[in-house]
């Protein structure tokens, strides 16, 4: 699964828990994960703590990712 780019539409508690698990188990590197959310400032903080890519909207996530999870 190392070559897959993963996207999240919504980056709340559930998405963050999934990302944390993926990163801890080294399933994917952070630079292959994209996320968007309604609150841009909060998204920047949370994606920054995981070092994943923040996206402005769902369209951008879909354009970047191979697989998208709606969380």
Tell what function each PLM region has.
Residues 68-69:
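N-terminal Rossmann-like NAD(P) cofactor-binding module of classical short-chain dehydrogenase/reductase
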Residues 1-64:
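NAD(P)+-binding Rossmann beta1-loop-alpha1 motif at the extreme N-terminus of oxidoreductases
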């Amino acid at each position: 699964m190392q070559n897959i780019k993963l996207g999240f539409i919504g980056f709340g508690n559930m998405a963050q828990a999934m990302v944390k698990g993926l990163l801890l188990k080294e399933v994917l590197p952070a630079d292959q994960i994209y996320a968007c959310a309604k609150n841009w400032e909060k998204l920047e903080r949370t994606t920054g703590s995981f070092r994943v890519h923040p996206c402005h909207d769902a369209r951008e996530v879909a354009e970047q990712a191979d697989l998208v999870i709606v969380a």
